[in-house]
């Protein structure tokens, strides 16, 4: 099966005053955080790339992303679509494996 070049998944950003922004991928059972929105988005992309690479390497099923309109959010939460370009992730991971 051909691997996808790009994945796009919803992430839920949770805002609590005085705390980092929590980021959860409901479809992937994965979470991260960031000091601000920019940092949270970068962390989310990095996490998404790692999770998807792991699923591909394990030949695990890739879950379908939940449509944004199906997410149930609290007042302090926002849904954000996060994308990752996998060819660069795969290259970086294979280079990392060779260098070890």
Q: Which functions belong to the PLM regions below?
A:
Residues 24-26:
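Short, proline-centered helix/strand-breaking motifs
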Residues 28-39:
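A short, exposed loop/beta-hairpin motif centered on an aromatic-Gly-Thr core
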Residues 21, 33, 92-94:
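Short acidic, gly/pro-rich beta-turn/loop elements at beta-sheet edges
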Residues 1-8, 45-100:
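Short, charged, surface-exposed hinge/linker loops at domain edges
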Residues 1-19, 31:
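N-terminal segment of the canonical double-stranded RNA-binding domain
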Residues 40, 44:
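Conserved anionic group-binding/transfer micro-motifs
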């Amino acid at each position: 099966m051909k691997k996808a070049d790009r994945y796009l998944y919803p992430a839920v950003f949770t805002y609590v005053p005085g705390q980092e922004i929590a980021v959860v991928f409901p479809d992937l059972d994965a979470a991260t955080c960031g000091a601000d929105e920019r940092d949270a988005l970068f962390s989310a992309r990095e996490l998404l790339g790692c999770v998807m690479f792991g699923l591909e390497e394990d030949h695990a099923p890739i879950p379908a992303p939940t449509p944004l309109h199906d997410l149930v959010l609290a007042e302090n939460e926002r849904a954000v679509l996060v994308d990752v370009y996998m060819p660069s992730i795969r290259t970086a991971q294979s280079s990392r494996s060779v260098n070890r």
